[in-house]
Swiss-Prot record:
Keywords: Ribonucleoprotein, Ribosomal protein. It comes from Artemia franciscana. This is Large ribosomal subunit protein eL38. GO terms for cellular component: cytosolic large ribosomal subunit. The gene is RPL38. The keyword Protease does not apply. Belongs to the eukaryotic ribosomal protein eL38 family. One of its GO terms (biological process) is protein-RNA complex assembly.
Length: 70
């Protein structure tokens, strides 16, 4: 079941949870989508600023499996 998050802080809090398994990063010409797979929900975050997206990518937890999609 997908849920969309609007705040970067909320996304980072969810990414640090124990049940967070993986994060898929999907880049488009106009935005970047972060899809976080947890045990119950798939959380999505859409960022239109590419600099903020790069910062968020670097600040993801090191134990989280990150996969970049085209």
């Amino acid at each position: 079941m997908p849920k969309q998050l609007m705040e970067i802080k909320d996304f980072l809090i969810k990414a640090r949870r124990k049940d967070a398994k993986s994060c898929k990063i999907k880049k488009n010409p106009d935005n970047t989508k972060f899809k976080l797979r947890c045990s119950r929900f798939l959380y999505t975050l859409v960022i239109t600023d590419s600099e903020k997206a790069e910062k968020l990518k670097k600040s993801l937890p090191p134990g989280l499996q990150v996969k970049e999609l085209k």
